[in-house]
Amino acid sequence: MKSLAKLTKGVIIVAMKTLIGSAPVLAGTFVYVSNADDGDIGVYSVQTDGSLKPGEHAKAANVVMPMAVSPDRRFLYAAARSKPYSVFVYAIDPNTGALKALSVSPLAESFPYISLDKTGRYLFGASYGSNMISVNAIGEDGRVAHEPLQMIPVGRNAHSIRTDESNKFVFVCTLGSDQIFQFTFDSKTGHLASNTPAVFLTKPALGPRHFITSSDNKFVYVLSELTGTVTTFSLNSDTGLLTEVSSASGLPPESKLVPGAPRGPVGTPGGPPPRNTDNDIWAADLHLTPNGKFLYMTERTNNSLASFSVDGASGKLIFLGSTPTENQPRGFAIDPKGRFLVVSGEKSDTISAYAIDETSGAVKLIGKYPAGKGANWVEIVSFD
């Protein structure tokens, strides 16, 4: 009996040493990357040091691009921009991060951007090629209704649609017409109605593309695809209307890039650009750290990740610098605790993970990890 007890104790000690010595996974934190050319979604688990461990891929469809996660983190939504236009719904395993295919529903058009309202009951889509937005209901089981509740024409080249933090207002950036559409939103019915005024007209040739709202709902930050600037707007929480505050460039002073022009939609022939675009500014995505202290944006022509500090009182941005990153970095995401940032490149065979310095906002490369073809949209989900 004493020998058995001794043996059991030894096994336990060895097992504990093995567990302690292994590279631990950051409890329930996972990265998802849509691979447009492969037609699938890459799954990665985040280790405690911010490194990534590649996992299984989930099948989707050709030109799968924008994604969104439900507020309760139960479901991942991914839209395919190839015909038939569809949204794929997956259940997220909180223990492994694995995606289980639940359903496929038709979408009205090719959407470069999808998002959910704060209740998770409605899916919004913005169509670049058809100049419209749509709203679809979502069931308790996460499935998207086959028929949209609304289809609303907006300005040319709609590129993003999101609610504010209160879930009472919705904004739409239309890149080709230099407009930001302002809506009121009824979360009980999913109905959008034009605010008054219905449109904020930006500066000419700005090309508003993506936007993000501060967590305190005081400011909206809008990325210009064509100028590489981020414009700060104050948000009136009572009326849902925007007022321009300031603007900051995400390009270093020595940059030789020139203002860009709207391009043809993905997945369709589109019209040829008005000139050679090799030296055009082509900004892509922006995100805030959860504490609101830093903002980042990507630019696809010079393959860079720009950093800004944020003045919480005024919303004004100060350009901190630019970091080389993946080739044609269309998408990136920041983990929910603001410790790590992951960037994908449409013309890269890797994705990059960075550590974020919580004091300075500086990013430091942790590592590069295998990616699928045409990697573009990135989502990070944490269950810790």
Region annotations inferred by a language model:
Residues E346-D349, T359, K364-D384:
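Blade-level signature of beta-propeller repeat domains, shared across WD40, Kelch, NHL, RCC1
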Residues Y44-G50, Y90-G97, N136-R143, F183-L192, ...:
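Short loop/turn segments immediately following beta-strands, especially the blade-tip
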Residues G55-G120:
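Blade-loop segments of beta-propeller domains
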Residues A36, R81-S82, Y128, I138, ...:
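Short loop/turn segments immediately following the C-termini of beta-strands
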Residues A61-D72, L107-Y122, M151-F169, L201-N217, ...:
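Beta-rich, blade/repeat-based domains predominating
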Residues L26-S51:
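An edge-strand/N-cap motif at the start of beta-rich repeat modules
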Residues K53-K59, K100-S105, E147-I152, N195-L201, ...:
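A short beta-strand motif characteristic of beta-propeller blades
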